[in-house]
A protein has these predicted regions:
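Beta-propeller blade termini and top-face loops
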Residues: 1-252
């Protein structure tokens, strides 16, 4: 059986929800729809529950509007990373990656590209929580159309918990990129996968060296602006799933 646990809050859409591994009573929710199109609903920041969703508290980042990803440190539920796409309809500085080390009492922006570019995906290294990969996405919605992609889109990596970031581009398509999806091996730190939207070289990419270089494996990337979600099998990182209208699976 199921019951609603968020109906009393003043927002109706989630971008992501994360459960603390070190204390499963604690949940964090990033509000605002992460998908594109005319009907994308915005949110009002991050919420936290300490009783498995029975009650919720707003803990900030109200002006981020669209949150795509929330990651909780596996050993410390007070450390949380939030990936914000920002306001879909206008330029704003409330985009990028925000980090809290005190359970949401305060936030620090640790990655910012520009006022048109936010975060569409993030993954944390399963063996080293100081290593985080982030996919940035330049996107804006206008009355007359939608602009998805640009020079701001790319893949970034930190090895020190967000203090410094490096852009990972070797082997990826040149020029403007669109939406990017990320997945990381749950047992081998250097194995990464990415779906890349590009005018000529869209497809499924793999890195075997922690993102230093990438190799295009195939051209599969259906309707990237809607989907671009991939996941690895927790026991065998050669098994990867891709969500689209259909469900795709690879074993090699």
């Amino acid at each position: 059986t199921w019951k609603p646990v968020f109906d009393n809050e003043a927002v109706s859409t989630f971008g992501d929800i994360a459960i603390s591994k070190s204390n499963t009573n604690i949940l964090y929710v990033g509000t605002g729809e992460q998908q594109n199109r005319q009907s994308s609903s915005w949110g009002n920041g991050v919420y936290k529950s300490t009783d498995q969703g029975e009650t919720w508290q707003s803990i900030g980042l109200e002006k981020t509007f669209h949150i795509s990803k929330v990651i909780v440190h596996p050993a410390n539920s007070n450390i949380v990373y939030v990936g914000a796409l920002g306001n879909l309809w206008k330029e704003s500085e409330e985009r990028g990656i925000y980090k809290t080390t005190n359970g949401g009492k305060s936030w620090k922006k640790i990655l910012y590209v520009d006022d048109k570019t936010g975060i569409i995906d993030m993954v944390m290294d399963a063996n080293n929580p100081n290593i985080v990969y982030a996919a940035t996405y330049q996107r804006m919605r206008k009355v007359w159309g939608f602009n998805g992609g640009g020079a701001g889109s790319g893949i970034y990596k930190t090895t020190n918990g967000g203090a410094n970031w490096s852009k990972l581009s070797q082997g990826l398509p040149s020029g403007d990129l669109g939406r990017i999806g990320l997945a990381a091996s749950q047992n081998r730190s250097n194995i990464l996968y990415a779906t890349i939207e590009h005018s000529k070289e869209s497809g499924f990419y793999r890195s075997a060296n922690g993102g230093r270089s990438w190799k295009k494996m195939n051209t599969l990337n259906p309707r990237p602006m809607y989907y671009s979600h991939i996941a690895t099998d927790p026991k065998d990182d050669k098994i990867v799933y891709m969500l689209a209208v259909e469900l795709y699976r690879t074993e090699d």
